[in-house]
Amino acid sequence: MKMLNELCDVLIDYKQKNPGANFKWRGQYIFRPKHTVNEEHIKKLADSGVDYLIVGLETGSDKVRYSMNKKHTTDDAEWFLEMFKKYKIQCRLLMITGYVTEELDDHRRTLELFSRWQKFVASETITGIELGSILMILDNSPVGQQKHELEMSFVNDKPYAWHSGKNPELDMFERVRRRIETHREAIKYNWPITRSLYRLNTIKHNLLEVVELM
């Protein structure tokens, strides 16, 4: 955060010294607990030329987000969205459905976001959402390093065909069901979904492959 603020200061200073420099810039951003960030930081982003950010929200569940080691809450994220709206910064949200620790109530909290935050879609603060396909477990990823703790097994070593003994209800078929339900809820509230058909075709391919192996 310190380095980002310093970068913004340099760019703001350059713009002030060069009135014709109307450049914009974009990047990835991380939501944080709102008590660690003030409004001045968001204003500084906008004044330096930021007009679009990609942010990993991941889920509507604070519990699941914490298990990913992402320590911001949904309320924290909403504060950032309000600030983005105020300072005309657009964003695209990245999501993961069916994370290893996700229970049905967590999934419902994700679905609730689409109606709750439809106002940010209407204001074009949120310009799109990336829903992904289905979660793949890679060996060297943080969750991949917890395979034994989460009692994970795989169908034919396929990274997307996993099962967790700690969350047995979340089999592949349930993950696909939740992913499709999330997709439908996003459409219901007019959220633009990026790479929509590509992701759905990937899910279809993965599901058919697992069915053949079973």
What are these regions (language model features)?
Residues 1-3, 68, 83, 95, ...:
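Detector for methionine-enriched segments
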Residues 1-92, 99:
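Conserved SAM/AdoMet-binding glycine-rich loop
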Residues 16, 27, 31-33, 54, ...:
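Intrinsically disordered, low-complexity regions enriched in small/polar residues
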Residues 29, 52, 94, 187, ...:
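Generic preference for well-ordered secondary structure
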Residues 32-37, 65-75, 92-100, 133-142, ...:
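Noncatalytic linker/hinge segments flanking ATPase motor cores
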Residues 83, 89-108, 121-126:
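Repeat-solenoid scaffold signature
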Residues 105-214:
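C-terminal accessory regions of radical SAM enzymes
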